């Protein structure tokens, strides 16, 4: 297996590194690449191997997993740097970044042309879910590719959903994030209203947490 993450330097304390650590703990032979040495060291200390480049990391890999910051990084890596041309046609690519659906489709189509199975599988669950191996994977792509990925995803997550064809995982993730944003904004406004009218924010939070307004945004404040 191989994990590529130019975002590990940013997310290794959050999701990328815990996900990789769970794979190592499960007995997978993992080769990792990231631009930030400290991020790589966390994983090599746990038993993973370090690669000097993304191209080196994917050499001979059965499964390639990437976690990158944005669409431009995903397209730049797989298409701009032609990483797809260096991945075996028998390999499976699991792209876990949260990116634009069109970007996910574009890369997936390029992979299909080369005979490479690829799914977009953005995650939800935060740092705690990544560390505990209870993430939710929201998958777009062919069902056959998802079933190939399932044994790997199950080492990192608890809930695995097939949202539809390529890019559908990203659409579903956007919908989830939109609702989360609404809940966060609404929770903040409700607490601000209470404080403005003399309520203790802790008391108000406790009240809402045991009432119909309870939501994850409130619980994690």
What role is predicted for each listed range?
Residues 1-8, 12, 219-220:
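Single conserved hydrophobic/aromatic residue that forms the stacking wall/gate
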Residues 9-59, 63-66, 91, 127:
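NAD(P)+-binding Rossmann beta1-loop-alpha1 motif at the extreme N-terminus of oxidoreductases
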Residues 30, 50, 117-118, 160, ...:
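Hydrophobic beta-strand scaffold residues
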Residues 54-66, 71-114:
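Rossmann-fold NAD(P) dinucleotide-binding segment
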Residues 79, 98-181:
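Rossmann-fold dinucleotide-binding core
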Residues 167-219:
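Helical "substrate-binding/catalytic lid" subdomain
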